[in-house]
Amino acid sequence: MSRRAYAEMYGPTTGDRIRLADTELLIEVERDHTLYGEEVKFGGGKVIRDGMGQSQLPAADVADTVITNAVILDHWGIVKADIAIKHGRIAAIGKAGNPDIQPGVTIAIGAATEIIAGEGLIVTAGGIDTHIHFISPQQIDEALASGVTTMIGGGTGPATGTNATTCTPGPWHMERMLQAADGWPINLGFLGKGNASRPQPLVEQIEAGAIGLKLHEDWGTTPAAIDNCLTVADDTDTQVAIHTDTLNEAGFVEATVAAFKGRTIHTYHTEGAGGGHAPDILKVCGEANVLPSSTNPTRPYTINTLDEHLDMLMVCHHLDPSIAEDLAFAESRIRRETIAAEDILHDLGALSMLSSDSQAMGRVGEVIIRTWQTAHKMKVQRGALTGDGARNDNFRAKRYVAKYTINPALTHGIAHEVGSIEPGKWADLVLWEPAFFGVKPAMIVKGGMIAVAQMGDPNASIPTPQPVHYREMFATRGGALARTSLTFVSQLALDAGIGARYGLAKRLVPVRGCRTVTKRDMIHNAWQPAIRVDPETYDVVADGALLTCEPAAVLPMAQRYFLF
């Protein structure tokens, strides 16, 4: 059987390479967990039939769902395998079949097992977006259809404060937003407002259910507020996210770093166009206690990046272009040199995460697209990374997928539940046809059940006739919704019984380990360079090397995928 024939029947195997969408990125299958000649496949005349690939074992001893012959792309590897799901969690990665007659079976299929055909598909962990302004609930539909299954941030709707800052302020708003979370088929976690100089206003938000606190310059990110916020976070094992002081009113970047006192913190849009000490906030990604992320409008650097940012900034931060001071504030944040350096710092693993900044200088449905566009641009401009060769870009792929899966999960204390494809974790999985990888998922599985899929005319005789578009599936309806999605809260809130007190239906999961995670824990993205930004030219130097690149004029994963 030729390699081509085998791939067409069972999907790629060890040594086969796959192009990701229309990029220059190639991944190569490193290992195949299935056994040649013993593969399982569903369909007429195929293997998964009673007494053949399907066993006589009862429901307790077989998988609820098996994704067959899929290529898994995760931070830990690129492998071909069958994926077992049981009780909404990933149960095993291995070889599925009938253990009574087949060798090497680690996943038993029975009459209780549903099959999702993974032949020829790539499976990734559900994306995690940690910079969400909850301005409109319709963001969730867009995010889920893009492959994001967890959203972390703050807000209360299109209030002026939420339009600018990712904060759900105070216990009353926190309770209302946690109640609203019950209506959406996605994992959610909310950040309280961290700008206060005394502990009580912050502690009461954690007790109300916040998984962390957000410091934002629009509320006054002073050294006193930073110190107090981090002290409360240390006491409650929650994370702090920060948007630093663009105007340098309360101090320069050195004063902010000093206020951290070596404590863990997540820096949003660390390049600075989204906000932060001008012009050198980028320096903080060399700190051991700083977990740096980007937001997607600057990803990657293109010929249009600078032009679109000014108007975005004026709207999002309630500025008036007719006021000279407001205009100067906006222009101070937009620097071609630091945006160009941001591309390279991502490629070298100094910037650890990527998120959206939804409707507040960011696009909620483009986290995954822009991550892979950045990876493509860097391969074209900088060549292979150390660890990759001429045949594949496996290490680069692992580095970039980690930026929106495992690293944000580690940062916000939810990696024990989500963020990777590993046994025991919540079965949030995204299935992609390689030609549409990173752009348009074929199917999104939430908590082991199909939540969203590309589906044709419901009145047609088969599932595929046009119009084919994303439609919500049964995991988004009735009681299934609350049993296939999670709401993350603080341990303090869980112990206080907010689930019963608020009347919540979703399972509440406490965050943990938020205060012990450091930059060295950021998988494939742990580089800590010494960075200097020239205050006059804005040139960025990391460990003595000037970081600069040209803007892209054309990108993959763009217009050809969005004709309609």
From Swiss-Prot:
Signal sequence segment: none
Entry's Gene Ontology BP terms: urea catabolic process
Record text on cofactor binding: Binds 2 nickel ions per subunit.
Modifications made to the protein after synthesis: Carboxylation allows a single lysine to coordinate two nickel ions.
Recorded catalytic activity of this chain's protein: urea + 2 H2O + H(+) = hydrogencarbonate + 2 NH4(+)
Residues bearing the modification N6-carboxylysine: 214
Binding residues for substrate: 216
Positions annotated to bind Ni(2+) 1: 131, 133, 214, 357
UniProt main location, coarse: cytoplasm
Keywords on record: Cytoplasm, Hydrolase, Metal-binding, Nickel
InterPro entries tied to this protein: Amidohydro-rel (IPR006680), Metal-dep_hydrolase_composite (IPR011059), Metal_Hydrolase (IPR032466), Urease_alpha_N_dom (IPR011612), Urease_alpha_subunit (IPR050112), Urease_AS (IPR017950), Urease_asu (IPR005848), Urease_asu_c (IPR017951)
Active site per UniProt: 317
EC number per UniProt: 3.5.1.5
CDD domains registered for this protein in UniProt: Urease_alpha (cd00375)
Cofactor or coenzyme needed: Ni cation
CC annotations in GO: cytoplasm
Gene3D superfamilies in the record: Metal-dependent hydrolases, Urease, subunit C, domain 1
Positions bound to Ni(2+) 2: 214, 243, 269
Entry GO MF terms: nickel cation binding; urease activity
Domain spans labelled Urease: 126-564
Cellular compartments annotated: Cytoplasm
Pathway per the UniProt entry: Nitrogen metabolism; urea degradation; CO(2) and NH(3) from urea (urease route): step 1/1
Family matches, as HAMAP family: Urease_alpha (MF_01953)
Subunit structure: Heterotrimer of UreA (gamma), UreB (beta) and UreC (alpha) subunits. Three heterotrimers associate to form the active enzyme.
Name of the protein described by the UniProt record: Urease subunit alpha
Organism from which the protein derives: Burkholderia pseudomallei (strain 1710b)
Taxonomy of the source species: Bacteria, Pseudomonadati, Pseudomonadota, Betaproteobacteria, Burkholderiales
